[in-house]
Amino acid sequence: MYYSSGNYEAFARPKKPAGVDRKSAYLVGTGLAALTAACYLVRDGQMKGEHIHLFEKGPIPGGACDGCQYPGIGYVMRGGREMDDHFEVMWDLFRSIPSLETEGASVLDEYYWLNKADPNYSLCRATENRGQNAHTDGKFGLSDQGCMELIKLFFTPDEQLYDKRITDVFDAEVFSSNFWLYWRTMFAFENWHSALEMKLYLKRYIHHVGGLPDLRALRFTRYNQYESMILPMIRYLEGHGVRFHYNTKVTNIEFELTEGKKQARTICLLVDDEAERVDLTENDLVFITNGGCVESTSIGSQDQPAVFNPTLRPGNGWDLWKKIAAQDEAFGRPEKFCSDPEQTNWMSATVTTLDERIVPYIQNICQRDPFSGRTVTGGIVTARDSGWLLSWTFNRQPQFRDQPKGQLVGWIYGLFSNTPGDYIKKPMRDCTGKEICMEWLYHLGVPENQIEDLAEHSANTVPVMMPYITAFFMPRTAGDRPAVVPEGAVNFAFIGQFAETKRDTIFTTEYSMRTGMEAVYTLLDIDRGVPEVWGSTYDVRDLLNAAVQLRDGKPLSDLKMNWIKKFALGKAVEKVQDTDLGRLLLEYKII
């Protein structure tokens, strides 16, 4: 497997890999990583669909990319997906997945057309004082010292950040800024999370720094993530004869480990609670989704809280990874990520408006018609003075194809599940859906004497507790996550958010899909390049632009410095003034 960039590799079709007709594939899970791997097995690996098996412990595929209506409970979306125009693997695959709505078009086609016609941007990124515009006004509000802390982190070698927290590299100069408000709520970072991952995010999305304040860097699907992303992949795979095995738990994978060689030998299953085994040869490839950010999820209802129960159950992704990791140190250290659910949890809630009484309060903040079918909030709106650090969003409506006319479906999340609310004086994790809605309505500016009535009769709210939703953000060191294909592995790979790949960032659709593609290309030795992570971190134009954007448009020559440094800077500017370098610095407003 090798990386590539440019159209030469992007538009090429690889030859059929040698011996692929004698091979079979078994995939643990049906999340985005596993579905991506299966699609690449079909498209580029040219493996027969009937040789490909996906094991799903539940009745529905999709993993964390869900979106459904639970009978008697209501619509539920545990999370949302923010996409980027440089998710190179995602677009490489989705150009080949047919649209379910537009004949002759791909998922990429309809996504591209949609976001061209209706580009995303926010008209109100944050509120305070019960629904009043916080007037962050597109500003980062970073001091010179805060900017220097970001720059220092950007250039710090990875190994110096192993097992370090963000609090080890930033102080109040960053934490009190609008930058941190935007960043932590957009990506769900907590102060105690990994400084290494923070650095990787900075480098990965340096080309989008200017789009952080109003979220114009983002792109969204037409419907919820399940209907817009997962379902087209399922239909593609089913159309090629790929076999899905539901209500099938993978309880263990047994390996034969010899010097210089690692081989998966047996898959242990529970199929409808009956034990089964699949014996493996070198021609039987296994793709393992280890860990899981939505394991131990609980769903509440309008009248019931979502219970916080982080117990790791047999047959889930963490239990499986622990059993696998016990067999070889190259298989990672799951305990680094799943041992402290108080530091890895947050809550979300899906709110459905039942009439038009709440709509004016939404419209007052987003400054758009929520029923237009176009962008509504343009990403999350954060109540910056919320005790729960509450954020909420309404994407294009309807969010579900079967959504009743006149209803809106939106999403709320709180980063702090264990602190009291501002109207509901108890932690979010102890609240029913109705109570979470009441807290949200309070921060929308609804008159207090109307809040309970609206929450009870004009909305249905379903809370979700996810104890391990940011487990991958915990501080880590080399070897904590297994390589996609560990050294010496002959017939297996790790895929998903807890597999290690170069330069990309976790908690993204692209990361899951990249690991799936890399796994297939490595094990089948497909002769085509995997598109590399977009190289903006090496593009001087993006670096110069970000340096000025982070200072809210002020040139670097305005940095506070003593007279000696100012004199030296002036002399340096004089030397490059009539050169291409000088013109570049002027173009990007560095000087």
Residues of each region from the PLM?
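Extreme N-terminal leader/targeting segments of oxidoreductases
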Residues: 1-25, 43-51, 550-591
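Helical element adjacent to the flavin cofactor pocket in flavoenzyme catalytic cores
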Residues: 203-285, 290-291, 303-304, 309-318
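Conserved FAD-binding subdomain of flavin-dependent enzymes
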Residues: 72-113
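C-terminal segments that line or cap access tunnels to active or ligand-binding sites in enzymes
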Residues: 207-221, 283-285, 290-515, 521-535
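Glycine-rich FAD pyrophosphate-binding loop
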Residues: 42-69
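A short, Lys/Arg-enriched amphipathic alpha-helix followed by its capping loop at the start of a domain
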Residues: 37-50, 236, 240
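Rossmann-like flavin
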Residues: 100-207, 219-220
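Glycine-rich Rossmann-fold phosphate-binding loop(s) that bind the pyrophosphate
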Residues: 29-32
